[in-house]
């Protein structure tokens, strides 16, 4: 997605620009709440929208419309605003929110939902999955649930991980200050092993003592996962949050 947007923005502004997103999602993962920023030279702004906004239209309304014409139908930019001083889409963020959806229906997933719901046509003990999830909340080293990246910390503050069932549809809602590579899909994959009674509830907690990614579970399919939101502090705290996050991530 980032490459597609960079190409479209470069075309619109007629100068090379690079978008920086709040979260770098795995291939196949969806995002309805992604936030990103880019720095644009002032001289390039007239290239993007030579016409003034319509009466009552937002400042970047013309840019929003024009950008939409350069993007494929499965990529949309829904809002553009001026960023406050000190804002960084990635490092100023307080937390990210993800949703994972799967269906246990024996016949699979409805065609109109198949792009964002994983078919899991077998019984799941949601109460056991919820109990195992509670053991994972808080500040931990999630190395067992992260793909290795050189010099990258795997310590994260997992603030929410709960499950709900609505008929055959099972939904996980996951929030943390940040997620390492494939962490959400790995958490879901491990918890599915608990839900199928292949592992006890205590197993996920035991994985937290590992220093490397575990091979005892399968990562959940990417298409069931969606980034649904990113939280930021008040404008006057953005720069400080940026510095704090950079310091933590560099350790």
Swiss-Prot record:
Gene Ontology BP terms: tRNA pseudouridine synthesis
Disulphide-bonded residues: none
Residues annotated as binding substrate: 98
Pfam families found in the cross-reference section: PseudoU_synth_1 (PF01416)
The protein's enzyme class: isomerase
Keyword tags: Isomerase, tRNA processing
Catalytic site positions: 26 (nucleophile)
Gene Ontology molecular function, alphabetical: RNA binding; tRNA pseudouridine(38-40) synthase activity
CDD domains reported in the protein's UniProt record: PseudoU_synth_EcTruA (cd02570)
EC numbers for this chain: 5.4.99.12
Record note on quaternary structure: Homodimer.
Summary of the function given for this chain in its UniProt record: Formation of pseudouridine at positions 38, 39 and 40 in the anticodon stem and loop of transfer RNAs.
Protein name: tRNA pseudouridine synthase A
Native source species: Mycolicibacterium paratuberculosis (strain ATCC BAA-968 / K-10)
